[in-house]
Amino acid sequence: MIERISYLNGQFIPDSECKVHVTDRGFRAGDVVYDMERTFDGKIYRLREHLERLYRSLKYVRIDPGLTIDRFEAMTLELLERNEPLRGQGNDYLVNQFVSRGNGGRANDPVPPTVGIRVQPINFAGYARFYRTGAHVVIPRTRSYSAQSLDPKVKHYSRLNFALAELEATDVDPDAYPLLLDLEGNLSENISANFFIVTGGLIRTPGESNILQGVSRTTVFELARKLGIPATGANLQPYDAYTADEAFLATTFYCILPVGRVDNRPLGEKAPGPITRKLLQAWSELVGLDIEAQALSHI
């Protein structure tokens, strides 16, 4: 059977051989950063911006990947080209770059990093129905990271608190998406997405101090500006989510996903709301593909 190709430590290899040793610090200590993009009809979206964020994360955690950002970009594009014959009509890929500190015992051991790139088909069926009904967002007990311990702007795989938050949310509703608070009780983010609310025609989202600075978040602001819809970052509390007219999540693979309920409380008259719809349509026009229709075609 023909399988997808991955990249690991200088080699393009079958995906089934893309493995790291159990002594790798990425596995043992979560000492690894990553980034992720998606394709639209095979064309990758904003790769350079994602790689720039990856390199900021690498600089912050003091891991030298051993290659330039231009080289990382070229390898990513080559990997996509090698896997394009397996993509299939109507499908698209998630693209994932990761860099761990390698197989050292301590963080300062002089060992080479582990550098990898993978592609995998987007699981449209896992979320497509929420374009019609709106997702259910649940605020769990587990809180998000504090910048005093690990800055949320770093995109990393040390995600045990996110796993606990997801379990707490799915205890309430097996299909729920967790929305974490920060240590001060402000809304922060979902485990893989930024959260937005719409109240009185104004789009608001948690400010940059307690969240990952999402590329998709930036896209939402750009589209809102183009559509003439006011949008801003702000400190938000659960009250703001409960009383919003609309809400949505924004991330790499689903772009914009309407939210219909927060902690079982319905939002507005119907999800998706009118501004959420306008943004999703504008994003579809931006990438030349009907994002909602593509996802719905897989259910």
Where on the chain are the PLM-derived regions?
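Conserved alpha/beta cores of soluble small-molecule-handling proteins
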Residues: 1-179, 183, 212, 221-299
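Glycine- and Gly-Pro-enriched alpha-helical subdomains that act as flexible
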Residues: 178, 186-208, 213
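Secondary-structure junction motif
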Residues: 216-217
